[in-house]
Regions:
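Short N-terminal helix-initiation segments at or just after the protein's N-terminus
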Residues: 37-46, 118
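Short solvent-exposed beta->alpha transition segments
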Residues: 27-28, 43-92, 99-102
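Short, aromatic-enriched amphipathic alpha-helices that serve as compact interaction elements
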Residues: 24-38
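Sec-dependent signal peptide recognition
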Residues: 2-7
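Bacterial signal peptide processing site
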Residues: 18-20
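C-terminal motif of bacterial Sec signal peptides marking the signal peptidase cleavage site
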Residues: 14-16
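Exposed beta-sheet edge and beta->alpha loop/turn motif
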Residues: 83-133
Length: 133
């Protein structure tokens, strides 16, 4: 029984190290996304996204969506992670939710990255400025 408890504790400790590493890598990806968004490099954001990223075929393209967000929110200067979730296994994902301060208004963002290479698989943003402007 003691051996089993030791193995469980060791497995938990090792997975905690992996999660901490993934949190830091995910935070770096969010910072990179904001740097590209602020610079107007929407093509690069789309090019670096996961090939499996699902975007509706009707309506604006992903690049047009990003351009509209940038135009309405302005420069996004800082952000704070509000939650982190990692789904392990085949097709796993890392999700980061954030409160972001932008020139026009604060925004709530949700990023979904593919496990491993952390390529953008999904993005959503909400803000009053996106609705009224």
């Amino acid at each position: 029984m003691r051996r089993l408890a030791t193995l469980v504790l060791l497995g938990t400790a090792l997975s905690a190290c992996s999660v901490a590493k993934d949190v830091k890598a995910g935070q770096m990806k969010v910072a990179h996304f904001h740097a590209l968004l602020n610079a107007g490099n929407f093509d690069q954001i789309a090019a670096e996204a996961d090939p499996g990223m699902h975007w509706p075929t009707r309506g604006p393209s992903f690049k047009d969506y990003l351009s509209s967000i940038h135009r309405k929110l302005g420069f996004c200067s800082s952000w704070r992670m509000t939650s982190f979730n990692e789904q392990l296994g085949l097709g796993g994902a890392v999700q980061i939710n954030a409160d972001t301060h932008c020139d026009a208004d604060n925004a709530q963002e949700s990023f979904v990255f593919s496990s491993g290479d952390l390529r953008l698989r999904g993005y959503a943003v909400t803000s009053r400025a996106l609705v009224v402007s």
